[in-house]
Amino acid sequence: MSERCCSRYSSGASIGCTPTSTQAKMVSKRIAQETFDAAVRENIEEFAMGPEEAVKEAVEQFESQGVDLSNIVKTAPKVSADGSQEPTHDILQMLSDLQESVASSRPQEVSAYLTRFCDQCKQDKACRFLAAQKGAYPIIFTAWKLATAGDQGLLLQSLNALSVLTDGQPDLLDAQGLQLLVATLTQNADEADLTCSGIRCVRHACLKHEQNRQDLVKAGVLPLLTGAITHHGHHTDVVREACWALRVMTFDDDIRVPFGHAHNHAKMIVQENKGLKVLIEATKAFLDNPGILSELCGTLSRLAIRNEFCQEVVDLGGLSILVSLLADCNDHQMRDQSGVQELVKQVLSTLRAIAGNDDVKDAIVRAGGTESIVAAMTQHLTSPQVCEQSCAALCFLALRKPDNSRIIVEGGGAVAALQAMKAHPQKAGVQKQACMLIRNLVAHGQAFSKPILDLGAEALIMQARSAHRDCEDVAKAALRDLGCHVELRELWTGQRGNLAP
C-alpha cells in the first residue's frame, strides 16, 4: 500500500508505523469492525481498488501494525439489492431480516434465517463475534421463546443458533437464557435432537465460564446431563455431547475467578446423580465405537477424584471393562479401527486415575492390567501420548507397591519405558513419566537397579535431565535411587545480605 494512505490506517497506538517486537509482546492491538470497513471503503473510493484487493491491502496494513484481526470479518460490505441501505455485511443483513421476521411472528421465515445464520457463523468465527456485538443474542432469544409455543422445528433451529453464537462467547448467556435452557432440556428430555443441541449450548456456555457453571448446576443441569445418557443410551451424538458437558463441569479453566467448584461438581455428578454407574453402563452399548468409548472413558477419569470413587469404578465392573477394552485394542478386535489410538490413551488415563487408590492398584494388576499397558505402549510406541499415559499408569501401579514393581519389570515395563524415552527424546511428558516410573520401580529395593542400568537407563535419564528443565528433579531422584552418582546442590544457603550472621 502506498505511503500516502498509510497514516490513515491507524490502529490507535503506533500510528502509521510497524510496532517494535517489544510493543507486540506487551499488547495485542485490536480494532473495531467499523475501522476495518472504513479502511476498505477508502481503498475502493480513493484508490480505485476492487473489493478483494481493497480487503487484502487493509489486512496487510493492519497486520503490519501488529493488529489482531482474528475477530474481524475480512470481506467488503455489500450494498443491498435495492440500494436503499448503507453497505453492510451479509451476517448483519441476515440478522436484520431475522429480527423483522421474529417481530412479525413468521416462523417459517425465522427458521430459514436461523439456518443461514448458523451456516455463516460456523464458517467464520468473526461472523459470530460481529453478530454478538450487534445484538444477535436478544434476537435469537426472542425466536427461542417464540418456538416454545410448540414449534419443535423452530425450537431446534433456535438452539442450534444459540450454540453457534455462544461458542467461544459464553458471557452472552444471561439469567433468563440460563433458566430457559434448563426448562427446554427438562421439557424435551424425550427428543434426542433437541437434547443434543441443548446440551451443546450448556457446554459452550460453561467452557471457561465458572459463573455459568455454578448457576447451571444450581438450576439443576447435572441430572439432565446424566439422564440424557441413560435415556438416549444408543444415540451417539447425545452421549458424546453429554460426556463433553459433564467434563466441562469439572474444569477449573476460568482465569477470572480465584477458585472454582470443579471438585464439588465432580462429587455431585457421582454422589447425587450416579455418574459412574451411568457412564459404565453406557459403555456396553458402544463396544465397537472407539470414538464414543473414548468420550466415556475420558469422563470417567475426570470423576475418579476420591479414594471411594476409584473403588466404586471397580465395584461397578468398570475395571474389567477397561482392561478388556485395552486388550481388544491391542489384539485388533474392534471392527472400527479409526480412533483406536485415542481410545487407548483414554483407557490408560482412566486406569491411571483409579490407581490413586492402593487397593485398586492391586486389583488392576490381578486383572492383567500391567500386561495390557505394556503391550499398548509397545504397540503404539510411535505415539508420545500413549507412551506418556502408559508410563504414568505403570508409575501409579508401582507407587508404594514392591510386588507390583516386580510384576511390571518382569513383564517388560522397564524395557518399554526406556524404548519410549529413545523414541521421543524431545517430548518432556514422556521423559518425565518414564523417569518417575523407573524411580518407583527401584525405590523400595535395589534388586532391579542393575538390570535397568544394564538396559542403558542412566544415559537416557541424563539426556532427559539436560534436555528438559521439567525433568530435573525427577531425573535426579531416579538416578539417586538407581545408585548412580548425583551431585546434589543447595539451591539457597541463607548467606546473602543480612540473612546470615
UniProtKB/Swiss-Prot annotation:
Transmembrane annotation, as ranges: none
Q: What is the effect of changing N264D?
A: Does not affect histidine methylation by METTL9
Q: Where is the signal peptide?
A: none
Q: Which residues carry this modification: Pros-methylhistidine?
A: H263
Per the record, the similarity remark reads: Belongs to the ARMC6 family.
Q: Name one GO cellular component term.
A: cytosol
Biological processes, Gene Ontology terms: hematopoietic progenitor cell differentiation
Keywords in alphabetical order: Methylation, Phosphoprotein, Repeat
**Extent of the ARM repeats:** 220-264, 274-318, 319-369, 370-412
How does it get modified after it is made?
Answer: Methylated at His-263 by METTL9.
Name this polypeptide is given? Armadillo repeat-containing protein 6
Q: Which InterPro entries match?
A: ARM-like (IPR011989), ARM-type_fold (IPR016024), Armadillo (IPR000225)
Q: Which organism is it from?
A: Homo sapiens
User: Is Lipoprotein among this UniProt entry's keywords?
Assistant: no
Q: Does the keyword Phosphoprotein apply?
A: yes
Phosphoserine (modified residue): where? S64
Give the top-rank taxon of the lineage listed in the UniProt record for this protein: Eukaryota
- Coiled-coil-forming residues are none
